[in-house]
Amino acid sequence: MRNPNTETVTMRILARFLLSASDLSHFPAPSVPEIAFLGRSNVGKSSLINTLLGSKLARTSNTPGRTRSINFYEVRRAGQPRPELLFADLPGYGYAKISREISAEWARFVNPYLHQRPSLALCLALIDSNIPPQESDAQLLEFLSAQRRPHAIVATKCDRLSGNRLQQAMRAFGQAYGGVPIVPFSTKTGAGKEELWQQIRAAQSQCPTI
């Protein structure tokens, strides 16, 4: 049975895949606020995007490192004639077998995107709530802070934890990651969906006109 609270956003959202870019020259021209989704390989970025959009636009895979480019999605509310947001699904990181390739890709086009993109309104760092704080995640958050990029943590797969264990995980994340806002999220139950949309809309409203 669907939760009506999670449908209030989904029914108003229309989205489409725009393009996939693995080079700066292929990025779409900045036009609307952009929301970047980042995280370790297999943390659930594509599944989270699909849950937010109420569709299956983003390809999901159990193979870590499948996303090797930045995938852009146009997002608008029903009734609006033009896109209001872009979602950017970035390549994952932190998986040993592909770490060298991913590192090269980050240096070539991901770091420049995060550093230079004028339309980037919010970076969502996805972290698996079922594992302890990781150094690679801490490094990402430090990088975003150094770049003065607005960012928040999305603690994925929270449905796998009991209430007490989830609270413990959130406390551990809060201590490890320096008080960055955290949204517990589940693609299975829809938990956190409304709160995350609130974060996105707030960032959208604060993004300078492009």
Each predicted region: which residue ranges?
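Conserved G1/Walker A P-loop phosphate-binding module
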Residues: 2-95
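Canonical P-loop GTPase G-domain recognition
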Residues: 12-25, 160-210
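Short, glycine/charged-enriched secondary-structure capping and boundary segments
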Residues: 31-32, 52, 100-103, 138-142, ...
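Residue-level signal for inorganic ion chemistry
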Residues: 73, 156, 196
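Active-site glycine-centered loops adjacent to acidic/histidine catalytic or metal-binding residues
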Residues: 89, 156, 186
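Flexible beta-alpha connector loops of hexameric P-loop NTPases
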Residues: 93-103, 130, 159-162
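Amphipathic alpha-helical transducer elements in NTP-driven molecular machines
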Residues: 103-107, 190-193
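Conserved C-terminal guanine-recognition region of P-loop GTPase G domains, centered on the G4
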Residues: 108-181
